[in-house]
Amino acid sequence: MSVNITQFNNYVAAGEFSVGVNTNENNNLLETITFVEEEHLTRLLGARLYNALQTDLAINNDGTATAQKWIDFINGVSYVDPSASDYTINYQGVFRMLKGFVFWQYISEHQYKRTSTGVRKLNAENSSMVDTQMTNALIRRKYNKSVDLYLCAQHFIDDYKTYEATASNIVESPATTYTVTISDTKYLANGDTVTIEGNEYTVANLVDDTSFEFTATTGLTFTDLTVSYEPFPDFKPVKPKYISFA
């Protein structure tokens, strides 16, 4: 999932996050990207959920997400606000957030200033206090914008803390195997735990937005067909802090 280094050292591609590094500085920037991704995503998700994300990313050789919930978390998605069905949330994902944090971390550590072609290193003899103040204000704005996006990412996960959908029927066939016919399985996966009438079951043989199976004692009947589950279990976020301009 890693943010690409060309998003920083190529001005056209990088835009607001260009740092104008040369080839010799690429290793430093790569180290910063790796550190920032792990640091901020662990704080955003909590350690166990971050590990779950890394496990999903490791499935594909190119490091892209496999599960739809992680695809949406990373890339962004528009969805209906669970608390206001007439309101659509346009969640932007985490790439811009991470780029802002990388920008702040790298520039802060290497004392750069922004020019028309990116951010260049300050020369102590030629730079003025105005240069330094402008540079500091710039990187603070980038950092605080990333904090905004960080909170949006946490809000997205919190909106899916518990997800509920209603099955059309639950049928036992053969004995001890139950098939749940359900048209909404958003962010559900094989191996997940669902709750039906207060009891927990493990999802198997999932067919997206169609059905899934679980195994349980024979002879069960269900009157309440509400299926609930947690798409992002073990979500334990750390709230970020804004940088003051005072």
Regions found by a protein language model. Name each.
Residues M1-F95, E109-T166, T177-T181, T221-D224, ...:
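Conserved short "hinge" loops at termini or chain/domain junctions
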Residues A165-N190, T195-P231:
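Small/polar beta-strand repeat architecture
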